[in-house]
Amino acid sequence: MQAWYHCENVYPFVPQEVLDRAPSVRASLPNKYCDPKIAADLFEECLDEHLLCDELGVNVVSIEHHSGINSLYGASPMILGILARQTKQVRILSLGTLITVRPDPVRIAEEYATADVISRGRLEIGFVKSGDSEMVSGNANPVGYVERFWEAIDLIQKTLTSHDGPFSWEGKYYTHRHVNIWPPVYQRPHPPMWAATGDPETSAELGRRGMVNALVLRGPEASKRAFDAYREAGLPAPGTDRFAYAVLCYVGDSDEEGLRVGSKTLWFLNTSLKQSPQMSKFLPGRIPAEATAQNYRTAPLPGAEAARRPADGLIGITAEQAIARGILCAGNPDTVYKQIMDIYDKVGGFAHLIFIGRTGFLDHKEAEKGIRLMAKEVLPRLPAETSTPAAEPARAAE
């Protein structure tokens, strides 16, 4: 199994009374509450954690969120460029550039190709539809975003795999009459492609495309439904290399330390998910028409759970509840290993463990200790991945 270190690089230092008054802690919270000197320290610490991962053989993840306390990584291509140059051996996953918010997929493909070349073929590309507040801060139209998501992926893939001169693209959402990026990708035909999603319909489409399906903080039950939909619709006998599971995770010397420090990661759920209704359930086009009426109610009626954001059910949970629901793994190395394997068995296996090892008030020293214990005491015991027979591994350009 491959482990991927995920650091949100959050900004948890806004006074609680400000957060309590704010209708949303994303998109609309004034940036006067973010001290750039503190932000500089956070960037340095988080990037150093990625370099530690490079020493220990733990792959790294670059994420992208905008305009809020939940993450300072608003410019994923810049982080990718830094990691591509500074790391030397591990894989780098972009999870990812928000393609439904960015207006130009060709530019995104160009950024990915450049990072792949700088890293000498260590890039993995992850796509994200984007959250509600991202649509607002990105000045994007949420109507038709699912179709736009798939067309952007198609255009990016064609851009990365075309090497015989310019081509033109006439799509429903994107038009490019001259596409011909330099440099081309280092890996051929293109770097491995992922998508972070949780609904079975999208997972089924990922299965048909042979992409890696990543489930982020969805728990074993929802993840199994998505993975099963992938298996039923996609490649025959897909291996575990097509599945990724992301979980809040902290490994301590003892169960007491692991749980105490790991509980700090729940800040991400309990504080940084707060959004105003106009940036969530009242945002047009984000919810199927048949669920809209129920979604607008103050309290959804029975049977209307599909209209809620998956994140809504995570706000306010305790560490014990999060562990029971497969959202958090915390304890000593033996305990965390057992927790991971319990999730592994429930979902039917996965080859990629994305462990969110730093968020909230969990500090740099604690994060580095957790990374070391994960790399040395837990990762070597996790099962090897199984490969998908029909999958052609990416290779370096000749």
Specify the residue positions occupied by each region the protein language model found.
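An alpha-helical appendage that flanks or caps ligand/catalytic pockets
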Residues: 4-37, 55, 146-182, 222-347, ...
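A conserved active-site cap/scaffold subdomain adjacent to cofactor or substrate pockets
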Residues: 198-222, 226-227, 231, 244
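Glycine-rich anion/phosphate-binding loops
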Residues: 41-42, 100-114, 330-338
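Acidic (Asp/Glu)-rich catalytic clusters
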Residues: 54-55, 80-89, 112-123, 204-208, ...
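N-terminal beta1-alpha1-beta2 module of alpha/beta enzyme domains
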Residues: 1-93, 191, 393-398
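Conserved, mostly hydrophobic/aromatic
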Residues: 3, 53, 64-65, 83, ...
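Hydrophobic faces of well-ordered beta-strands that scaffold small-molecule active sites
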Residues: 3-7, 61-63, 92-95, 123-127, ...
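Glycine-rich, proline-tolerant flexible connector loops at the mouths of alpha/beta enzymes
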Residues: 60-83, 99, 136, 217-218, ...
